[in-house]
């Protein structure tokens, strides 16, 4: 498929973060947006609240403590899934994260900190993942301006 004569698969999709280390050292993180969440949905089904009977009939008990706990864990794994799978182009050799084990994904930040990254640097890595997976107004505006100017300049910062 082409859009305006361009095959979307040929456009760059990798975003890069370079964290300096001393005068000459650097850590390079690369992230790409995830195309879908099918693998996540298969490995981590969304929790369902228990039902309760009220005077109005049967309704979901969204205040159930077990449901809230399950939902919190689910949302943490979902965020961690975005992080570890978006960072695949970085070729990170995780210490405790196993890509096939959803319960370990939440260790991404622990592993990065154990490797020497600060809280701020971990925040920048998370921002990189967010940037790779979001189509924000700034990106759309830049693309519009480049299109209207008739240029084809890479959209990355």
Residue ranges and their predicted role:
Residues 12-24:
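Short acidic-hydrophobic surface loop/beta-edge motif
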